Amino acid sequence: VRRGLAEDLSSYRIREKQDTEMKQQFVETIKIKEGQAQAIAYHQERMERTIRHFFPSLGVASMPLLERLLAPKAHMDFYKARVVYGESGVESIEYAPYSMREIHSLQVVEDNNITYNFKSTNRDCLNALAARKGSCDEVIIVKRGLVRDTSYTNVALYDGKLWLTPRQPLLLGTKRTYLLEKKLIQEADLT
C-alpha cells in the first residue's frame, strides 16, 4: 500500500524553483492526453532509478509518487508535464501544450565519448551535437560506430520487416521501454 499525499509531500517536498546552478537536476517529461498522464509507471521507474543512482541516501520511502503529484486538467488534450527534481525533492512541475516536431532530414554526428544515461536538465553534450546539424532538422548520434539516439528521442528504424532500436541507446526512453515490452520493436546493433 502506497503512502498518502501528505507523507509524499513532507518526505520529498515540492519547492519553488530556486537557483539551480551547480545542482544536479533531472527531468521527466510526461505526455498528457485528454487530461490523463500517460505511461506514468515507466516515468516513475526511471525517476526512482535515477534517484537511487545519484542520491542513494534518500531511500525508496522518500521517493515522490508522480501519480499523486501530477494534476492535469480535463482540457489538456495534448500537453506535456515537465517534472524537475533533484536531491532536495521535486523542484517544479510545469504544464505546456505539446507540439510535434516535423523531422524531414537528419545529419549523422559522431561522438565516441558522449554519455547521457540519465535524463538530466543539463543537456550541454546533446546541444553541442545538435548544433552540428547544419541545414538538417535533427541529428543521429553515433558512438563507437553504432547509432544511439537523436538529440531528443530514441531511434526506431524499419528494415522492411521489423522495427529496430539501438541495443545501447544513450538514454533508456520510456516509450522505447514500452515498445520493447510489447514486442513492437526489437533491439539491434545499428550501423
Per-region residue spans from a language model:
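Conserved alpha/beta cores of soluble small-molecule-handling proteins
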Residues: 2-4, 8, 12-146, 162, ...
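Short beta-strand/strand-turn micro-motif
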Residues: 148-154
